[in-house]
Amino acid sequence: MKYDDGRVLDTMVEVWDRAPGKPSPFDGLWTLKKRQTDNPELTNFTETKMIGGGHYIILQSANYRGERVRNFGFGTFDVKEDGKVLETGMVGSWEDYSGWATEVKFEMTDESHMTQSFIFNDREITQTYVRM
């Protein structure tokens, strides 16, 4: 194949590596249905979360102090023996997200619903998701 700028592509080879990690009962694509927190500065919060093979991706949108904010994050999802999960950020749009870790309590309420609870800025946050 020849491009307009003169480059020629004879063969394209893609190599994909699987990121190390274990599957979990939480693997899937989830959308936030309910968020409980006592932070009145954060409103209209939405989140989509994908969990799979020991990793997660989150996409968030909200109003913070009246201004629209959008963020994303990717990291490891390590299920511990006590059922809690250690989420460690690898890359994201938040400042200092790489290496940021938090312990999260996950619970499957049925096959299509889960909750997660964690502490952020001294506030407990509980979020309920439905499987997409």
Q: Whereabouts are the PLM-identified features?
A:
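Lipid interaction determinants
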Residues: 1-76, 80, 84-132
